[in-house]
């Protein structure tokens, strides 16, 4: 490499074409090519394109008891929940279940003051790469997406952003966690999948 040589600029389109060509020749596998393509789309994608819609979000309500919150947490198995007051558009904060269970036995007022943290609000037009950088810097991996009127469109997590780059993570994790199924056929015989 000649350090005095002029740098050759390569466009996004040329890199995409090289990745496709490498994939067709078998030099780059399909998953690697998909990640390269997703990387270039990442900065063009608004967060509302992949946010979990407000109708699909499990919420905690300020007028519920801690017992109701615990039941909701056990039934839905998420790690962070928006806490709303009166309407879904009035998010007063977010609750991480680690904090909720760490303060088990405390009053609801204590939980609201010490465990429910301020929500990170973002406009629906924010690009995925901007939110990714913001979450990385702030270490806040949960954002409430708002429409132009301040109403909640949905939520986006760091996991959602990563899935835009590398594909669905939950299915991959679920496959790893699945144990081979087995069934007993007779006293000395078992059928084991896998």
Feature locations, PLM:
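Soluble cytosolic regulatory domains appended to membrane proteins
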Residues: 6-194
């Amino acid at each position: 490499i000649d350090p005095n040589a002029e740098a050759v600029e390569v466009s996004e389109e040329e890199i995409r074409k090289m990745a496709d060509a490498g994939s067709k020749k078998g030099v780059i596998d399909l998953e690697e090519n998909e990640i390269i393509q997703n990387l270039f789309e990442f900065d063009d994608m608004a967060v509302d394109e992949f946010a979990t819609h407000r109708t699909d979000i499990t919420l905690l309500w300020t007028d519920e008891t801690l017992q109701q919150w615990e039941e909701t947490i056990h039934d839905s198995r998420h790690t962070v929940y928006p806490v709303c007051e009166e309407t879904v558009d009035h998010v007063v904060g977010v609750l991480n279940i680690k904090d909720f269970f760490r303060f088990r036995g405390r009053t609801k007022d204590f939980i609201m003051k010490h465990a429910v943290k301020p929500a990170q609000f973002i406009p629906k037009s924010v690009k995925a790469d901007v939110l990714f950088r913001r979450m990385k810097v702030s270490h806040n991996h949960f954002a409430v997406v708002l429409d132009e009127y301040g109403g909640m469109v949905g939520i986006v997590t760091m996991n959602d952003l990563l899935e835009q780059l590398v594909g669905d993570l939950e299915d991959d994790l679920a496959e790893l966690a699945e144990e081979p199924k087995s069934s007993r056929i007779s006293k000395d015989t078992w059928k084991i999948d896998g």
